[in-house]
Amino acid sequence: MMMMAMANDKVRVIITDGQKKVRIPTGLRMLVRRACIAVLREEKFEGNAEVCVTFVDNEEIHRLNKEFREKDSATDVLSFPLGENGIYDVNPDTGAKQLGDVVISLERAEEQAAEFGHSLQREVCYLTVHSMLHLLGYDHMEPDEKAVMRKKEESVMSLIGLTRS
């Protein structure tokens, strides 16, 4: 399992590769970091933040989906927020607000990228943006919530230069 921590003045993104089935393209980790930062900027998030992003395979995300959501299937991304209503635990070592964990199945992302006709990088960044919005409290259970979330996703993807082609 490979870990890579990346930080700037306000955002620490810890990326862990917990799978061996999909080769991580050059530059993907930097794009994921940019996606996390773009969401926080777009949402005008105040203070230092910390988020963990883990890449897994379909088998592992299936296990997590079953354990935590009682859904017996693989999915593309899971979000595990550590805060609620804008209140987050603070890392005592860094003072950063701990937003939570993003878990992405690179296998599923690769399948979806092929299905939608775009790159794995774009798909993983979209899933990162989607999950980051969940960590900040957004949801898509109701049609109006879904519309708001989709608009925010498109706005952030545009900011990082990964619009739909």
Feature locations, PLM:
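An acidic/histidine-cluster motif and surrounding catalytic segment
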Residues: 1-125, 135-165
